[in-house]
């Protein structure tokens, strides 16, 4: 009985020790967690205070680079040449030798018209030629006899002259017959319709078996020359002088075609021609550029964005466009000094596009300027420089001039 009581007592004591240990461990862990949270909150408060006193900003460094000067506009792709194929002779269409949408070369057979009537006409005029040729030969023989008789005074000079005239008439008639033969052969040739230019054929306008008329009454198909291919676009009249100067300085003025969203370069070509007058309703002038189109990336009536390079500014000091600020006094930037304090610096800008701006006056190479976080800045404010997120730095400042197209404009303010 005593042994059983001792066992119960021992078990109770062990359980009490375990409970007490767990209780003290839990309190220690709770106190430690609260301490860490308070420490983190205190650290965050210090960081917030630091950002309040020294606001976080992103900066970029002014650098020297070559800046291309582009002019841009919206253009429409058009075929270099467009031909509506028609028949030059009338007749029944007996065959088509093309598939809709295929490419053809100049001289390829497109269609055939029933040639029998033209073959008959050719045979007819050839027969007439043979008949008149025989008559001419007989008249020439008579002329030889007349000449002999005239020497013997057997016939009058009038009779001889008459025979000479007859021979000449038949000679002229033979020439007319030859012309008729040539015309008949030509008409027979026209019964085989060939491609007048190389290009892409469109949808057929008439089916086999139908009667096709001569001239432009019944078109057969339309062929568009798409390699090379042209783009028609317009620029403001103020840009004419820059384009003409570029033409004078360069044999070929480079023109680039981009897609509708200015995301993908489609083709690069050259300026082909400039219109001779300004559209008074829009204040623009039309221009045409020509592109190689072997890959068929340009299609007639397609809308594209055009970039025309008129100049390149060498050794220019540039900064990101985001760093440029504007006030009633003009353009300025927030320049960062060696102590990471900012000062407002008035600048004069030159060439500017969507990515960067040329600084003509006010900054030097290596100067740091604030690009993001300018709202909280005042003269002499200390700053905390932070790096941009990866998503924000995907298109870096060093790549800004190469990433996507943008129109350029020149300012001096």
UniProtKB/Swiss-Prot annotation:
Coiled coil recorded as keyword: no
Disordered as annotated region, ranges: 394-413
Listed NCBIfam families: PRK11556.1, RND_mfp
GO biological process: response to toxic substance
Subcellular location: Cell inner membrane
GO cellular component: a single term: efflux pump complex
Domain of life: Bacteria
Species, as recorded: Xenorhabdus bovienii (strain SS-2004)
Signal sequence coordinates: 1-25
Subunit and partners: Part of a tripartite efflux system composed of MdtA, MdtB and MdtC.
InterPro entries (alphabetical): CusB_D23, Multidrug-R_MdtA, RND_pump_MFP
Name of protein: Multidrug resistance protein MdtA
SUPFAM superfamilies for this protein: HlyD-like secretion proteins
Keyword set includes Acyltransferase: no
Family label: Belongs to the membrane fusion protein (MFP) (TC 8.A.1) family.
Gene this protein is translated from: mdtA
GO molecular function, one term: efflux transmembrane transporter activity
Assigned keywords, A-Z: Cell inner membrane, Cell membrane, Membrane, Signal, Transport
Membrane topology listed for this record: Peripheral membrane protein
Pfam families, sorted: HlyD_D23
């Amino acid at each position: 009985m005593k042994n059983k009581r001792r066992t119960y007592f021992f078990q109770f004591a062990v359980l009490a020790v375990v409970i007490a240990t767990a209780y003290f461990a839990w309190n220690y862990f709770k106190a430690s967690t609260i301490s860490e949270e308070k420490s983190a909150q205190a650290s965050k408060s210090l960081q917030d205070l630091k950002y309040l006193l020294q606001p976080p900003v992103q900066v970029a460094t002014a650098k020297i680079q070559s800046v291309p000067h582009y002019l841009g506009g919206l253009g429409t792709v058009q075929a270099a040449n467009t031909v509506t194929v028609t028949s030059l002779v009338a007749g029944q269409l007996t065959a088509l030798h093309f598939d809709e949408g295929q490419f053809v070369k100049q001289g390829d057979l497109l269609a055939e018209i029933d040639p029998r009537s033209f073959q008959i006409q050719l045979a007819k005029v050839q027969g007439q030629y043979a008949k008149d040729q025989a008559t001419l030969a007989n008249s020439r023989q008579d002329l030889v006899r007349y000449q002999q008789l005239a020497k013997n005074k057997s016939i009058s000079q009038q009779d001889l002259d008459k025979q000479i005239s007859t021979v000449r008439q038949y000679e002229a008639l033979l020439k007319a017959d030859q012309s008729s033969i040539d015309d008949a052969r030509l008409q027979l040739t026209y019964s085989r319709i060939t491609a007048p230019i190389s290009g892409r054929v469109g949808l057929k306008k008439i089916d086999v078996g139908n009667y096709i008329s001569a001239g432009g009454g019944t078109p057969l198909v339309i062929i568009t020359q798409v390699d090379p291919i042209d783009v028609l676009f317009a620029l403001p009249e103020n840009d004419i002088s820059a384009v003409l100067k570029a033409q004078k300085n360069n044999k070929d003025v480079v023109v680039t075609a981009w897609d509708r969203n200015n995301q993908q370069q489609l083709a690069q070509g050259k300026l082909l021609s400039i219109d001779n007058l300004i559209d008074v309703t829009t204040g623009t002038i039309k221009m045409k550029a020509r592109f190689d189109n072997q890959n068929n990336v340009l299609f007639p009536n397609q809308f594209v964005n055009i970039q025309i390079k008129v100049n390149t500014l060498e050794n220019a000091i540039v900064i990101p466009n985001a760093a440029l600020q504007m006030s009633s006094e003009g353009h300025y930037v927030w320049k960062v000094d060696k102590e990471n304090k900012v000062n407002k610096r008035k600048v004069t800008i030159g060439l500017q596009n969507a990515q960067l701006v040329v600084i003509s006056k006010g900054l030097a190479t290596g100067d740091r300027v604030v690009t993001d976080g300018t709202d909280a800045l005042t003269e002499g404010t200390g700053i905390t420089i932070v790096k941009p997120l990866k998503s924000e730095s995907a298109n870096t400042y060093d790549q800004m001039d190469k990433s996507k197209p943008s129109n350029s404009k020149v300012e001096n303010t």
